[in-house]
A protein has these predicted regions:
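Short, well-structured beta-strand
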Residues: 133-159
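Sec/Tat signal peptide C-region and signal peptidase I cleavage site
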Residues: 17-21
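Surface-exposed amphipathic alpha-helical segments
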Residues: 151-177
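Acidic/polar, low-complexity extended loops/arms that serve as protein-protein interfaces
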Residues: 110, 125, 134-135, 158, ...
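A short, polar/proline- and glycine-enriched secondary-structure boundary/capping micro-motif
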Residues: 94-99, 136-139, 159-163
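Positively charged n-region of N-terminal signal peptides that target proteins for export
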Residues: 1-5
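Short, solvent-exposed recognition patches
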Residues: 23-133
């Protein structure tokens, strides 16, 4: 009988915790609608073409993310310069934000390329360059929620600075929901 009473009390305790958890407010902020981020993706610069911007909100491993993306190309040749800009709203996964940005502080340089921390308009970031593949990438964290990624192919890494200037980081930081 004592075992039955103990099991009953234990079950009531678990039920009470579960009910309390159901009534607690969700403290994880919602990601923004992709339609609010797509206008932040710039138009093609002179001499370039841009594909239609795309975006979606998805549930990834129990966390929601919003991602918008646009591809750019200069010319039709096989080795033509290309660029891709993505904006990822990761506000619902602060552990991912912390782990990713924490790794940006390490600088390295080899004969194959380099990786280094950067600051863009007060925002932390990371720049990487692979010499053999002629591939440059820049990641910038905006408002502790948005990852802006620029990836260039067949361009010099200094071009990353020109591309990031085309993205209105201040306007992006103001978008909350």
């Amino acid at each position: 009988m004592k075992t039955l009473v103990a099991a009953f009390v234990l079950a009531l305790g678990f039920a009470a915790v579960a009910l309390r958890a159901q009534n607690e407010p969700n403290l994880i902020p919602d990601v923004v609608d992709p339609a609010k981020l797509i206008p932040i993706l710039p138009e093609a610069p002179t001499g370039w073409t841009a594909e239609k911007a795309e975006g979606s909100s998805d549930d990834v491993g129990g966390f929601k993310i919003t991602n918008v993306h646009r591809d750019y190309r200069k010319g039709e040749a096989a080795e033509a310069p290309t660029a891709a800009i993505s904006i990822l709203d990761a506000v619902a996964n602060p552990d991912y934000v912390e782990a990713t940005t924490g790794a940006w502080n390490q600088a390295s340089e080899t004969a194959e390329g380099y990786g280094k921390p950067v600051t863009i308009d007060g925002n932390p970031g990371r720049e990487d360059y692979d010499k053999e593949r002629k591939q440059a990438s820049l990641w910038v964290m905006v408002a502790k929620r948005y990852f802006v990624e620029i990836e260039l192919q067949n361009q010099e890494p200094k071009e990353l600075q020109e591309w990031i200037k085309r993205v209105d980081l201040k306007k992006l930081a103001e978008i909350k929901k």
